[in-house]
Amino acid sequence: MKILIISQYFWPENFRINEVVKFLKLSGHDVEVLTGEPNYPKGEIFKNYLSEPDKYKEYFKAKVYRLNARPRKKGSKLDLFINYSSFLYKSIYFSLRKLRKKNYDIIFTFGTSPVTTSITSIILSKFTGSKTAIWVLDLWPDIVFELNIIKNKFLKKQFTNLMESIYKKTDLILAQSLKFKQNISEKINNDAKVKVLYQWPEVLEDNSEDRNSDINFEQKDLNIVFTGNIGTAQNFEHVIKVANACENLNVKWHIIGTGRDLNNIISLGRISKKILFYGLRDKSEMLNFLNKADVLLISLREGNAINSTIPGKLQTYLLANIPILGSIS
């Protein structure tokens, strides 16, 4: 099949859509990708990309179209609004100019927040005659309502109507959990076109050279490891409170990752010396962190949409065969 994948995030950024593209190409499909310039999560375009952009025009022989949408920058509400809007506008403009005469069988949207990226898929499909599919990884806009990112009642109604319209106009909806499927099916009164596609464990390299020279994992301690995004949904202020309460115990908390809430968390006040922040690390280092952990941590804020979410890291944690500590409903 000839497949166009539309995703705001793509290699060299670390998202599972990279593995989807690789799998489809190795399975013999003709795949193209429409994406932005890599800048997640720090909001700055990757230096390697800027110095040699031609190296990022193909991924496992899949052609990659790059849009110069505005980066996330500091990740404020305004920054993210401009970032999302910029990508949506430029993806519609580019696809109608360059891709509308292509005979795609499927236009597939990688549905991270906000799922408005699928608007491009729906519009383009009217010209190409393609079927459309979306993999929904966030129950947007429900999740931003629960996090109080959007409070205005008029905007809430408009975004809710927009999302329901997107679902109804999409041919196949893949939900990341059974509760996602139930939620979406009820909204559009159509169970048949909503299927479940769970996330899978990340493919982690075995870094036998042990490049993690700065890891301070002492055998006398219970070493708790968290990997991934530190955003509003992760409820990290609660994690910090618990860690501070355990300060007199032989427990260390190793936080690998970054996110828009990291600076806010650090500015909350006293943070135990037993909470160690490693920042953003290369994917090739993750296996060493997991192998040295005694316990792996998952944390999510409470809410109906959030409670329906299966964090992507859970499958990877399960594969590590290490106890998991969850602050999650």
Segments predicted by a language model, with ranges:
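Carbohydrate-associated surface elements
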Residues: 37, 179, 197-200
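Membrane-proximal helix-turn-helix segments that form the acceptor-binding/catalytic region
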Residues: 20, 116, 123-128, 153-173
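Nucleotide-activated donor-binding/catalytic signature segment of Leloir-type glycosyltransferases, i.e.
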Residues: 221, 248-254, 262-288
